[in-house]
UniProtKB/Swiss-Prot annotation:
Component of the CPC at least composed of survivin/birc5, incenp, cdca8/borealin and/or cdca9/dasra-A, and aurkb/aurora-B. Interacts directly with incenp (via N-terminus), and may weakly interact with aurkb (via N-terminus) to stabilize the complex. Interacts with GTP-bound ran in both the S and M phases of the cell cycle. Also found in a complex with ubiquitin-mediated signaling proteins including at least usp9x/xFAM, nploc4/npl4 and ufd1. The lineage of its organism: Eukaryota, Metazoa, Chordata, Craniata, Vertebrata. Component of the chromosomal passenger complex (CPC), a complex that acts as a key regulator of mitosis. The CPC complex has essential functions at the centromere in ensuring correct chromosome alignment and segregation and is required for chromatin-induced microtubule stabilization and spindle assembly. Stimulates the mitotic kinase activity of aurkb/aurora-B in the CPC. Does not appear to exhibit anti-apoptotic activity. It comes from Xenopus tropicalis (Western clawed frog). The keyword Cell cycle applies. This is Baculoviral IAP repeat-containing protein 5.1. It is found in: Cytoplasm; Nucleus; Chromosome, Centromere; Cytoplasm, Cytoskeleton, Spindle. Gene3D superfamilies: Inhibitor Of Apoptosis Protein (2mihbC-IAP-1), Chain A.
Length: 160
């Protein structure tokens, strides 16, 4: 029953963790164990510049996720260009459309960018959020029915 809740909590945690990833150095630091380090296009530096964060799993050591659009890519090859792969698979990513460094944005520009990042999160995880809300509503309804049944010593038929 709580699988949607767990996925929702994990997704929100990722959204919060990634708010610091506007900083190139923070993104780069996630690539400490990246399998491609030299003589290739997908070096840690190039991956971080393209907005990626290294999110390895036990079975997939080369998973990279854009901190902005949350697009996850795996199966990297040495000749894969991070910018090209990112734009092919997430052309509407707000990070890709930046024309200047985040530090050079006005406060208004940065807030608009952050609002776009949060919208991307909700687009990606809206079904998880909806499932979580539905599960919580069902559980709350059940608790209320049990409470009122016990208070008034009657049974309530939900199928009517």
């Amino acid at each position: 029953m709580h699988s949607a809740k767990n996925r929702f909590v994990q997704a929100v945690q990722r959204l919060q963790d990634f708010r610091n990833m506007y900083d190139y150095e923070a993104r780069l630091a996630t690539f400490a164990d990246w399998p491609f380090t030299e003589n290739c296009k997908c070096t840690p530096e190039n991956m971080a510049k393209a907005g990626f964060v290294h999110c390895p799993t036990e079975n997939e050591p080369d998973v990279a996720c854009c901190f902005f659009c949350l697009k996850e890519l795996e199966g990297w090859e040495p000749d894969d260009d991070p910018w090209t792969e990112h734009s092919k698979r997430s052309a509407s990513c707000g990070f890709l459309s930046l024309t200047k460094c985040v530090n050079d944005l006005t406060m208004e520009g940065f807030l608009r960018l952050e609002a776009d990042r949060i919208k991307s999160f909700y687009r990606k995880f809206s079904t998880v959020v909806l499932q979580y809300v539905e599960e919580e509503m069902t559980a709350t309804t059940k608790r209320l029915l049990e409470y009122f049944s016990n208070q008034h010593q009657c049974s309530i038929d939900l199928d009517r």
